[in-house]
Amino acid sequence: ELYKEDTQKAERAALTLIDGLHENFRKRAGQADVLKQLIADSPYPTLVCGDFNSLPSSYVYHTIKGDKKGDKKGNKKGNKKGNKLQDGFQTSGHGYMYTFKFFKHLLRIDYVLHSPELKSTDYFSPDWSYSDHNPVVMRMKL
């Protein structure tokens, strides 16, 4: 009886965790769709930086960057100039980089994305003891 009760508690806890993660993924996807539209409507060079809490393979990352054709509703509207944003790490970073300190230093979930007109010259993420994320620094040529 005790084993059955413990198993049921563990199952409920796991389902609650999964529901919470799903809700967070859904919220971030909606925010990415809104940001994509703002970027698409802007006639100016764009710089987007922040804690996306999403991997480089995620819907959020690719939507904000402009890699995905359309949002989750199927709307297809790209940047007015037809440009995708570039990932500063890919344009001027070196080697392997993580920004989330836990999970064995495997996750890069903080980004600086920029229009091709903006030129990055250096990109790094120094160790930082004040947060569970390391900051991201990108130098640019103006």
Which positions does each model-derived feature cover?
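Metal-dependent phosphoester-hydrolase catalytic domains
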Residues: 26-47, 52-142
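Catalytic-adjacent loop/helix segments of enzymes that bind and process anionic phosphate/sulfate esters
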Residues: 1-38
